[in-house]
């Protein structure tokens, strides 16, 4: 009887230890909160699409129904020291030049603007060495496009 209680007690301690380690691992591996859209495009612009820059931030595509323009901004999850960032936007059909912003920034790159009423757009951005691009999206509506992580 004592032996079975000792084994049961050891098993309970082992399970408790594993549960504690699992909790500690989960807590320490918590991801950084995703960057929220910061309103950098100005009043009247609403987020119509976004794509994460893995572990670093988010690129937001916004649109103003009043002006008919798209706007893109790349936002870091955790602002801090200056790091290389860029953001870009162009018409998928090649009817416009690329508009972009790049440099060493503490929190976001952009905004960049392009008339977008009824056209598909290519857009994306980067934070440090992690980049993402979306091709052929939105086309005058809320549509996902093709996402490429680099």
Locations of regions flagged by a protein language model:
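Secretory targeting and sorting signals
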Residues: 1-29
């Amino acid at each position: 009887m004592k032996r079975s209680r000792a084994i049961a007690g050891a098993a309970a301690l082992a399970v408790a230890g594993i549960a504690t380690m699992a909790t500690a691992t989960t807590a320490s591996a918590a991801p950084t909160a995703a960057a929220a859209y910061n309103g950098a495009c100005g009043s009247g612009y609403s987020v119509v699409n976004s794509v994460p820059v893995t572990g670093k931030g988010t690129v937001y595509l916004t649109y103003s129904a009043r002006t008919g323009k798209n706007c893109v901004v790349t936002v870091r999850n955790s602002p801090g020291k200056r790091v290389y960032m860029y953001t870009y936007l162009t018409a998928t059909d090649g009817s416009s030049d690329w508009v972009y912003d790049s440099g060493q920034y503490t929190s976001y790159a952009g905004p960049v603007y392009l008339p977008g009423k009824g056209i598909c757009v290519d857009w994306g951005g980067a934070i440090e060495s992690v980049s993402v691009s979306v091709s052929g999206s939105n086309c005058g509506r809320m549509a996902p496009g093709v996402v490429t992580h680099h």
